[in-house]
From Swiss-Prot:
SUPFAM superfamilies, sorted: PRTase-like
Binding site residues for 5-phospho-alpha-D-ribose 1-diphosphate: 107-108, 111, 133-141
Transmembrane segments: none
Family: Belongs to the purine/pyrimidine phosphoribosyltransferase family. PyrE subfamily.
Top EC category: transferase
Role noted for this protein: Catalyzes the transfer of a ribosyl phosphate group from 5-phosphoribose 1-diphosphate to orotate, leading to the formation of orotidine monophosphate (OMP).
Coiled coil: none
Keyword Cell membrane: no
One example of a Gene Ontology biological process annotation: 'de novo' UMP biosynthetic process
Species, as recorded: Cereibacter sphaeroides (strain ATCC 17023 / DSM 158 / JCM 6121 / CCUG 31486 / LMG 2827 / NBRC 12203 / NCIMB 8253 / ATH 2.4.1.) (Rhodobacter sphaeroides)
Reactions catalysed: orotidine 5'-phosphate + diphosphate = orotate + 5-phospho-alpha-D-ribose 1-diphosphate
Signal peptide (residue range): none
Protein name: Orotate phosphoribosyltransferase
Amino acid sequence: MIPTSFPPREEIARLTARMLLEIEAVHFRPQEPFTLASGLPSPTYIDCRKLISYPRIRSTLMDFMAVTLLRDAGFEAFDNIAGGETAGIPFAALVAERLGLPMTYVRKKPKGYGRNARIEGVMTEGQRVLLVEDLTTDGGSKLSFVDAIRETGASCAHTAVIFYYGIFPETIGRLQAHGVTLHHLCTWWDVLAEARASGTFDAGTLAEVESFLSNPRDWQDARKPADPTKSL
């Protein structure tokens, strides 16, 4: 069902953050940092995949996503909704249902047998495709999916995520340089504000998280494992 009312962006961000905290998708651990895919430490971790197990929250967030896309991209901006393997697939299906559009998904790499395709489902030349994922940190992983979509002759100028880290300034520029606009529901800053308001974490933890969010590179550099060759 296509939404007919448009809540303010700030309210969408606040409620999204609240839901993520409610289902304990947000983890803060400054004393024992998580390791990102890049190998760098982080005091924060978010598990958006948990959302598929909470129908009421899942449904509300997909309404928010549809509203965000209709308002910011347009009512007739897309012909096809593509999910990125694997976390983006369920959310792409839900967004496609909301907008009444076909759904496809993009593999990270070809299967290696059969059609050896990266696109599953029907995607045709000239279609305007929206790439849907659960989250993005620096935007890098989205570009491979976008390239696979464009190789079919379709266009992809937009990607939508539930959660955007919002702390690496190069992210938006990297996507824009590739001709892609990012749409998102909330960021770490929204989660931090809601965590403070709800008292979900203690003040010391939140202060350390804010230090990371304000200057992630410096925070990470100070906590990188020592290079053993430096002492030789």
